[in-house]
UniProtKB/Swiss-Prot annotation:
Alphabetical list of PANTHER family matching this protein: LONG CHRONOLOGICAL LIFESPAN PROTEIN 2
Name of protein: Long chronological lifespan protein 2
Signal peptide per UniProt: 1-21
Record-linked InterPro entries: LCL2
Gene: lcl2
BP GO annotations: ERAD pathway
Assigned protein family: Belongs to the LCL2 family.
Organism in which the protein naturally occurs: Talaromyces marneffei (strain ATCC 18224 / CBS 334.59 / QM 7333)
């Protein structure tokens, strides 16, 4: 007679502990707002340009401040590419340059394709 209530209590305990474990799993998986000891959550980048504006305004440069990298250079076409490991800088002449994806081409291939496109051949 005592076995039935004890079994019911034990079953209820197992269901509650399983549900709690599932909620903890989903909370951790989806970055729930609970405080976790030992884990620092990185702050998400803002969707507005306030950080960029503050950094731009706080940067000291007496020459030209590159808008993409905030590098201080003598001329705009001297600006480095933001991602040099995957981009190639192509000078267009007239003091301007663009950064293009390397895309697996051989060295100088991007510049050649841009020049052909400028001539209307490509």
């Amino acid at each position: 007679m005592l076995a039935k209530p004890l079994t019911a209590i034990w079953t209820l305990f197992l269901l509650i502990s399983t549900a709690q474990a599932q909620f903890q799993f989903f909370e951790q998986m989806f970055g729930g707002g609970g405080s976790h000891q030992g884990h620092q959550q990185e702050q998400e980048a803002s969707s507005d340009s306030s950080w960029y504006q503050q950094t731009w305004e706080g940067t000291h440069c007496t020459k030209y401040l590159c808008p993409d990298t905030l590098a201080c250079v003598h001329f705009p076409h001297h600006c480095p590419c933001p991602h040099p490991s995957v981009e190639e800088k192509v000078e267009l002449g007239e003091g301007s340059a663009v950064c293009v994806s390397r895309g697996g081409w051989t060295a100088g291939e991007a510049a050649r394709k841009i020049e052909l496109a400028r001539k209307g051949v490509l």
